[in-house]
Amino acid sequence: MKEKVSMVSLGCPKNLVDAEVMLGCLAKDQYEITTDEHEADIIIVNTCSFIGDAKKESIDTILDLADRKHDGRCKLLVVTGCLPQRYQEELATELPEVDIFVGTADYPRIAEIIAEKRGVAEQLRYISDPNYIFDESLPRLKSSPAYTAYLKIAEGCSNCCSYCVIPSLRGALRSRPLDNLLMEARTLVATGTREINLIAQDITAWGRDLPGSPTLEELVRELAKIVGLRWIRLLYAYPDGITDGLIEIIKTEPKVCKYLDIPIQHISDPVLKRMNRRSTEPQIRALIAKIRAEIPEIALRTSLIVGFPGETEEDFRTLLHYVEETQFDRLGVFCYSREEGTPAAGMEDQVSERVKRDRYKKLMKVQARLSFKRNRRLIDTEEEVIVEGYSDETDLLLKGRSSRQAPDIDGQVYITAGNANVGDIVRLRITDSSDYDLIGEIVEE
């Protein structure tokens, strides 16, 4: 009888791709994959440790699933990813329930590693220098719906922002070759994928370390040639890497969603300098103005950090006013997390947790109002929407996402009239909206 494996993946989509590679390797090695942890002989927790909240979620999940070794059939608990890569010594002591720790360099060896545990009583650790990069020859068992997929175009990061632990956990930038990416993309489309979301720590850095230094716009142009692919979405595009050529291909290529995720993190120059960000306030303002002028219909998402060391009330007011002025369509806000080993952790003028939370609430309150306002502008317009199934609230409504909404992080569209199948891309007339969601009816073609 095949042993059953269950996987819980935490954190970002980049982590999800790593989890899918491990599942693919295990399925190829004759393990049976199950989504029910109670049925699993082996449970794997793929962790995140980017910020404090992510670490807490990872630890809580590990402790919860450790109970399956007592009240379920679980024989092995395996913890993979960023948390063991960063805290291997501490975790080995504090989590004796865990049988195997695997860092970010050994995902393709997961089946071999589990086999090495047979007959070995002591806890095992496999933590190597982070040099892994996904290759299209590795199996990948996609866990997301067939119609959508993430395409991880690079691993690691060489930006060295002062608050970030990613370079120490994932290593320096390592881009996947163009032909490698195109091969995987074609395979995804051949198995039903209609939307590909490009991801990396910084997608604009893709190609800098490859022979000939190919650019992101070259990659997008080649992806757009794939027959059957309908949407290409760009996530995690650092502002200093966005070129006129990239703006032009978003503007002119029909398959590229009029959507761009640009994590600016702040707008005040003193804060940006302490963050070791390469963009300045004038440069960010000019970039956003240029994008909006060239592509008026584009949906812009950004990420911001509040409470960074030394952030004054004046810095925060500058940020708040900029958000009100710019009116981003989507906004993610994070309270600064003091991460040991980063330059920012040792900075003076650390901001209190109370002030961080207060600034977070103020910013999100403003964004809710702005998002509602921008959504109202879409009423009586038509949008392309990918159908994702029935609404969570009622099976009388279908739900989906427009090309202006990324999976998992943005709002949804609720479909009140018309028929469609999951994965269909339909035209929808927007009839109403809320702070973050849209409501509409399918337009018969």
Swiss-Prot record:
Cited PROSITE patterns: MTTASE_N, MTTASE_RADICAL, RADICAL_SAM, TRAM
Keyword annotations: 4Fe-4S, Cytoplasm, Iron, Iron-sulfur, Metal-binding, S-adenosyl-L-methionine, Transferase
Any one GO molecular-function label of the UniProt entry: protein methylthiotransferase activity
Radical SAM core domain ranges (all copies): 143-373
Record-level GO BP terms: tRNA modification
Cofactor(s) the record lists: [4Fe-4S] cluster
Binding site for [4Fe-4S] cluster 2: 157, 161, 164
Binding positions for [4Fe-4S] cluster 1 per the UniProt entry: 12, 48, 82
EC top class named in words: transferase
Domain TRAM: 376-444
Localization in the cell: Cytoplasm
SMART domains given in the database record: Elp3 (SM00729)
UniProt-listed InterPro entries: Elp3/MiaA/NifB-like_rSAM, Methylthiotransferase, Methylthiotransferase_CS, Methylthiotransferase_N, Methylthiotransferase_N_sf, NA-bd_OB-fold, Ribosomal_uS12_MeSTrfase_RimO, rSAM
Family matches, as Gene3D superfamilies: Methylthiotransferase, N-terminal domain (3.40.50.12160), Nucleic acid-binding proteins (2.40.50.140), tm_1862 like domain (3.80.30.20)
EC number: 2.8.4.4
PANTHER family: RIBOSOMAL PROTEIN S12 METHYLTHIOTRANSFERASE RIMO, RIBOSOMAL PROTEIN US12 METHYLTHIOTRANSFERASE RIMO
HAMAP family in alphabetical order: MTTase_RimO
Job of this protein: Catalyzes the methylthiolation of an aspartic acid residue of ribosomal protein uS12.
Designated name of the protein: Ribosomal protein uS12 methylthiotransferase RimO
Organism of this sequence: Geobacter metallireducens (strain ATCC 53774 / DSM 7210 / GS-15)
Lineage, broadest ranks: Bacteria, Pseudomonadati, Thermodesulfobacteriota, Desulfuromonadia, Geobacterales
